Amino acid sequence: MRRGSIIGYDLNENTCQISYYDEKSDEPQTFEYAQGQSLIPLKLGYIKEQWVYGKEAELLEQKNPSCVVSDLFGKAVQRKKVRIGSKVHDAVWLLAKFVGLTLEDFEDIRFITFSTPYTNIDMSKMLKGIGRHLGVDKENIYVQDYKEGFCHYMFYQPKELWQYESAMFFCDGQTIRAYMLRRMNVANGQNRDMFVTVDEV
C-alpha cells in the first residue's frame, strides 16, 4: 500500500493522472501505474467476473470491444446507461468504479481534489458523490477546473514569476488548449491586493 492522504485526481475525456502528497515527504508525487507511465487511459472493462482498467482495458478492447467502455467521463457527465457485455450499468457508477480501482494502492485518503477541463454544478455533485463513495468526508472533497488549478499552482511558485504572464498548455493527443494567467491592474494603484485572471486563448 502507498501512503498518500492528499490526492489530486486530474480527469478528462481520455485519461486521468493521479498526484499524491504524504506528510512525510517534501513534494507531491505523480503516481506511475506502470513503469514510466502516469497517464492512465480512461477505459474500463469487465471480463471473467473481473474489472480491468487503463492499458489492460485497451488490450481487452482489441480482442472484445463489447466488454470495454471508453469515453467514460463524457458518458458519466451525460448520465448515460452503458452496456458492458450482457449487463447495462449507469455511467456514473462505472466512473466511480474506475476511480476506485485506480486508487486501490492508497490506504488512507483524507482529502481529494478532482481537476477537470470545465466544471458545472452537476459535475461537481457527481464527483463529490464519487469522493464520498471512496470514504472521504464531504467537506474534504474539492472540484476545480484547469483554470482554477493553474491559479493554485502559480500561487505557490516564487513571487518573481508573478511579474510575467504565465502560460499552461494542455494536450490530449487530439486538442491543444492554452491558458494564460495575467495580473490585473487595480483602479487604485495603492491597493496591495492582487487580482489575477486566467483566460483560455
Predicted regions: what they are:
Residues 20, 124-128, 152-157, 179-182:
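Short acidic, glycine/serine/threonine-rich loops at helix termini
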Residues 2, 8-15, 162-177, 181-185:
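A short acidic Gly-Thr/Ser loop motif
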Residues 130-135, 139, 145-166, 172:
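Hydrophobic, small-residue-rich alpha-helical packing segments that form membrane-like cores
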Residues 1-81, 132, 140-152, 187-191:
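Early-domain small/polar-rich strand-loop-helix modules and first-structured segments
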Residues 76-108, 125, 130, 198-201:
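Glycine/Thr-rich phosphate-binding loops that ligate phosphate moieties of nucleotide
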